[in-house]
Amino acid sequence: MEKSYDCFAEYGLHGTGIRALAKHCGCTSNMLYTYFENLDDLIIQSTEYCMTKVEDDFMAKAPTDVEDLWRFIDEIPYWTAKKHGKKYRLMYQVYTHPKYREYGQKFFKGVDERYTEYAKSLEGKLGIPYEKITPLIFILIRACVHYALFEDEFYLKSQIEVLKETLELFVMKYNPKFKEATK
């Protein structure tokens, strides 16, 4: 699945047929049809699989302690753009296509749930309610993906600046002891 997704990411969704995919994967077209009902099934399954791996890569870098939070916010947009930019572009191409939109909605519902769980894990460490942390995670993710798609430095920096300032305000409101400890 990963090889087929990489092939789509490299050559485009519409310019890549089953023969090109098979060649890229080192197999025959018939072999692909052994695993997938049709090209749409291959696109749907490989997109979900690869974007889950991208999310896992991203979360593996996510901070587990407060001291690492600011570094993570500064570095992750550039890292993920370099490592996953083509995959994000293809994901948006697939999940915004009318034929596959429902699969995108399903995937992002799962993303919402996973990031909410991550926010809950940060709640005790930051002292900020997870209901406040969750939207900040979404802002960071959106800024990262937008940067990976368009390399729009202005958009990225303005989002990151607001994110950091909001985090500082929440820390002062909910956990002033942490703010003093990091000075």
Where are these regions (language model features)?
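Short secondary-structure transition hinges
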Residues: 75-117, 150
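Hydrophobic alpha-helical connector segments
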Residues: 45, 58-83, 130, 134-137, ...
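Helix-turn-helix
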Residues: 3, 7-41, 45
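Solvent-exposed, amphipathic alpha-helical segments
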Residues: 3-10, 53, 57, 61, ...
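Short, basic, alpha-helical segments at the C-terminal edge of helix-turn-helix-like DNA-binding modules
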Residues: 18, 47-55
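Hydrophobic alpha-helical segments that form the core
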Residues: 128-150, 158-169
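C-terminal effector-binding regulatory domain of bacterial HTH transcription factors
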Residues: 174-183
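Amphipathic alpha-helical packing segments from all-alpha helical-bundle domains
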Residues: 55, 99-127, 131-135, 161
